[in-house]
UniProtKB/Swiss-Prot annotation:
Catalytic center residues: 87, 179, 181
Species for this entry: Anaplasma marginale (strain St. Maries)
Residues that hold ATP according to the record: 232-238
Enzyme class name: ligase
Pathway field: Purine metabolism; GMP biosynthesis; GMP from XMP (L-Gln route): step 1/1
Keyword Ligase: yes
Protein name, as recorded: GMP synthase [glutamine-hydrolyzing]
Residues of the Glutamine amidotransferase type-1 domain: 3-204
Length: 529
């Protein structure tokens, strides 16, 4: 099986490169800049192609070249392994080979236009010589002057004239200032496909092959030990637990913790799935009082996440002790959780996830995270491979900390119950209207401000709730629904929101105003906290 190694310099979309490569049927892994690829090669580990990611830093700040870059280019010279540098990776290549890289006079962010001045095997069938093409840029530095010796310019920025694409055909080294991995670059997927063809990669990576590999990896990692699985009824933990159960059978103990912060009827959904449909035993722990006690008076979202993460692990450690010889804790952590927590060497932290940055530094259980390198859409594909019902796989994502991060400010029992009912009305009406399956994620947020209203002949002073609905494929970027829909569809959704607003205000005491969140990701995250 071919392998593409992606060197992560801290871009928030690095994992999209891995996802695009996998979509094209080639296995990919993400490595930190400190990786010793020469040592890996000496141990017989074969890498078929390298991709250097973007990142938030500047090559002007470098004191020497990262080990991984030296290794990558030495392996390119010795073994002819193709290399593609993207954005910061492109600047790194230019810097390594002697070009001057400095801050641009005019920085480029978002859509940009390029003039195609030379053909390239990367752009074959994608760009036409002499054409003007649009791409997605996000950079502050550019090559100043000429490209390095041995390289030629394929495309320049139409606005600034800066080099946007250079290549060294003899050594199969390619550098692009733009981001072919994002959906906003037309033809980006085809360019990556051409790069994989140049590398001679075999297209044999599928969810079936991933499943086979992971079963072996789980067996090896657990080494006969028992595993306690943290399940929530959501897509991620459901797929992860079924996968681990397939690998180790009865050595897996499933535990469902009712934090008091879950969706309405969640415990029943979990019992129906795992006990009724999958014939897996589940221990149900009602720890709602403990979580509410720990969260009392806390307003800061990062502190809330840390408390939930620490309490979550504490509960599982206690349960593991009561169960006997438990050595491992399974969690349904996925790639976007890891990325946004900024746990890589070069990543910029956005927020903690209770499955990642919210974990205490010292644990008495070793983690098993079989989905850690999968995106949400890949998790669903794996779930289908495992035979999970669509009723579970098509559920909207729900955050590990639950409703606590959808209540701005302090979490109280009153606020949790109010938000739970608001969310239930919103989602039930969305299902009834046939909208649910067209939306990637929808939820309600309780805003800790009160506004004046009028109901009947009386004055009210109630909370504001915000409704959110987004479209996405992987959770890394998202548009508010119904962006991109027809005008008729937009009007239908507006009418739907009005019905939901009336239902919430009419049926629930404590809320007298409903607003809709129109923000995309970026600049916002999907969840409010």
């Amino acid at each position: 099986m071919s392998t593409v190694a992606i060197v992560d310099f801290g871009s928030q979309v690095t994992q999209l490169i891995a996802r695009r490569v996998r979509e094209l049927g080639v296995y990919s892994e993400v490595f930190p800049p400190s990786t010793d690829f020469q040592a890996m090669a000496s141990r017989g580990i074969k890498i078929d192609a390298f991709i250097l990611s973007g990142g938030p830093n500047s090559v002007q700040q470098l004191h020497g070249v990262p080990n991984a870059v030296s290794d990558v280019l030495n392996l390119n010279l010795q073994k002819g392994v193709p290399v593609l540098g993207i954005c910061y990776g492109f600047q790194m290549l230019a810097h390594y080979f002697g070009a001057d890289v400095a801050q641009s006079v005019a920085r480029e962010f978002g859509r940009a236009w390029l003039d195609v001045i030379e053909p390239s095997s990367i752009t074959e069938g994608v760009w036409s010589l002499g054409s003007k093409v649009d791409v997605w840029m996000s950079h502050s530095d550019s090559i100043v002057g000429e490209v390095p010796q041995g390289f030629r310019v394929v495309a320049r920025s139409a606005d600034t004239g800066a080099v946007a694409f250079m290549c060294n055909d003899e050594r199969k080294i390619y550098g692009v200032q733009f981001h072919p991995e994002v959906a906003h670059t037309p033809g980006g997927r085809e360019m990556l496909d051409n790069f994989l063809k140049i590398a001679g990669c075999t297209r044999d990576w599928t969810m079936g092959s991933f499943l086979h590999t992971q079963i072996g990896a789980i067996k090896s990692a657990t080494d006969g030990g028992r595993v306690v699985a943290a399940i929530s009824g959501g897509v991620d933990s459901s797929v992860a637990s079924v996968l681990v159960h397939k690998a180790i059978g009865e050595r897996l103990v499933c535990v469902f913790v009712d934090t008091g912060l879950l969706r309405k009827g969640e415990a029943g959904v979990v019992r129906d799935l795992f006990v009724g449909k999958l014939n897996m035993h589940v221990n149900v722990l009602d720890k709602s009082a403990l979580f509410m006690q720990r969260l009392a008076g806390v307003q800061d979202p990062e502190v809330k996440r840390k408390i939930i993460g620490e309490t979550f692990i504490e509960v599982f450690e206690q349960e593991a002790k009561s169960l006997g010889d438990i050595k491992f804790l399974m969690q349904g952590t996925i790639y976007p959780d890891v990325i946004e927590s900024g746990v890589g060497e070069s990543g910029t932290k956005i927020k903690s996830h209770h499955n990642v940055g919210g974990l205490p530094e010292i644990m008495n259980l070793s983690l098993v995270e079989p989905l850690r390198h999968l995106f949400k859409d890949e998790v669903r594909l794996l779930g289908k491979e495992l035979g999970l019902p669509s009723a579970i796989l098509d559920r909207h994502p729900f955050p590990g900390p639950g409703l606590a991060v959808r209540i701005m400010g302090e979490v109280t029992a009153e606020r949790v119950e109010l938000l739970r009912e608001i969310d239930n009305i919103y989602i039930d009406m969305m299902r009834d209207s046939g909208l649910y399956d067209h939306i990637w994620q929808a939820f309600a947020v309780l805003v800790p401000v009160r506004t004046v209203g009028v109901m009947g002949d009386g004055r009210t002073y109630g909370y504001v709730c915000a409704l959110r609905a987004v479209t996405s494929s992987d959770g890394m970027t998202a548009d508010c629904f119904p962006f991109g829909e027809t005008d008729e569809r937009k009007l239908e959704f507006l009418a739907f929101l009005q019905k939901v607003s009336r239902a919430i205000v009419s049926n629930l005491q404590g809320v007298n105003r409903v607003v809709y969140d129109m923000t995309s990701k970026p600049p916002a995250t999907i969840e409010w906290e």
